[in-house]
C-alpha cells in the first residue's frame, strides 16, 4: 500500500515539473501580430471575421484585401504545418464541411 502511495506521489511530482502542452489561445494574437510586424509584413495581417465562412470564399476575400498574399493554403483543421513565417502566405484551416474554423493569419 505504501509503495503504491509513493508511486502516486512520484507521478504527481513528475507531472507538475513538465510544462503543459496546450493549444494557442485567442489572447496570443497580439504576440503573433508583433512578430509579423518585425518581419515587416505589409497589408492586413488577420481576418477574424472569416471564421465560419466557406474556405473558397475566404480565400478570395484574403487575396482581395491583401494583394501581397500569393499563397493561400487550405488545410484540414489539425493538419501538421511548418513553423516558418512567410509574409506572402496565409493558411486557412477548415473542417470537413469546408468552413473556416480558425482565424486566418499571415505567416
Curated annotation (Swiss-Prot):
Protein keywords: Protease inhibitor, Serine protease inhibitor, Signal
One Pfam family named in its UniProt record: potato_inhibit
Gene Ontology BP, a term: response to wounding
Site (Reactive bond): 83-84
InterPro entries registered for this protein in UniProt: Prot_inh_pot1, Prot_inh_pot1_sf
Domain of life, source organism: Eukaryota
Signal peptide region: 1-23
GO molecular function, one term: serine-type endopeptidase inhibitor activity
Prosegment residue ranges: 24-36
PANTHER family: PROTEIN, PUTATIVE, EXPRESSED-RELATED, WOUND-INDUCED PROTEINASE INHIBITOR 1
Family: Belongs to the protease inhibitor I13 (potato type I serine protease inhibitor) family.
Name of the protein in question: Proteinase inhibitor 1
Amino acid at each position: 500500500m505504501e509503495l503504491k502511495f509513493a508511486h502516486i506521489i512520484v507521478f504527481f511530482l513528475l507531472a507538475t515539473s513538465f510544462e503543459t502542452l496546450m493549444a494557442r489561445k485567442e489572447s496570443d494574437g497580439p504576440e503573433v501580430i508583433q512578430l509579423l510586424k518585425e518581419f515587416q509584413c505589409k497589408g492586413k495581417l488577420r481576418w477574424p471575421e472569416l471564421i465560419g465562412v466557406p474556405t473558397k470564399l475566404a480565400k478570395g476575400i484574403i487575396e482581395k484585401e491583401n494583394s501581397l498574399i500569393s499563397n493561400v493554403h487550405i488545410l484540414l483543421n489539425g493538419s501538421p504545418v511548418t513553423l516558418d513565417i512567410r509574409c506572402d502566405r496565409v493558411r486557412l484551416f477548415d473542417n470537413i464541411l469546408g468552413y473556416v474554423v480558425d482565424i486566418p493569419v499571415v505567416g
